Amino acid sequence: MKIGINSIIGVTTVATVMSCSSAKKEYASFELYPVRTGSLTEMEYTPEATKFTLWSPTAEEVRLMLYDEGEGGHAYETVKMELGEDGTWATVVNKNLLNKFYTFNVKINDKWQGDTPGINAHAVGVNGKRAAIIDWKATNPEGWENDQRPPLKSPADMIIYEMHHRDFSVDSTSGIKNKGKFLALTEHGTMNSDKLLTGIDHLIELGVTHVHLLPSYDYASVDETKLDENQYNWGYDPLNYNVPDGSYSTDPCLLYTSDA
């Protein structure tokens, strides 16, 4: 999911905790890398504290960078992370970080490699450069915990429709309000100028039972701050695999959930 806050670009004080000594790990092959144990989650939020973890066994140092905004501005705090036995770096920040943003900064071969939201980020700011700190329970639509897929007796019963989010609804005659957006899949009763069904209702009348979505994750080539410009890509240039792309949202800076 995409989440963001209107950016206020400015200079802030950076509090940095530096390491007195660097961890140096060398491995003869990938097979010798330690295997991460436990959850792959890189951010675990509670109002009292947030735990951050990053699996990076070859890193010499890892820093957590905290931001007020999803883009622009500077990190307001830098926190040293500690290395565990399985190659995972971790730290806990004992304060309420709800709606803040973060990146990891990794040093390898005595060189800082730049910022990353982590490969397991599930919420990011505009254009996916920083991960977002959110309360997962608060993002679920009402009744989400009771949602169940329709029963399927046999895979042979499936009638599959391959769909690209933008192409499915973007046509000017589609009769769909949220053209090219995720919300287009929630609209019913839409018709074109010839009074023919469009959108989800058209798939239903075709007898489609399953929809195969072309890439929906966050990809790099579309600038989500310039959606009024003519930008297009099918999405085969992934940036954050576990985050829906912001260009398909009605506003990349806002959070909306729907159980449709």
Residue map of PLM features:
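Conserved, mostly hydrophobic/aromatic
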Residues: 54, 163, 213
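The feature marks proteins involved in alpha-glucan
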Residues: 23-47, 83-187
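Structural beta-strand segments of beta-rich domains
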Residues: 48-52
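Bacterial N-terminal signal peptides that target proteins for export
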Residues: 1-8
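Conserved small/polar residues in nucleotide/adenosyl-binding loops
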Residues: 256-260
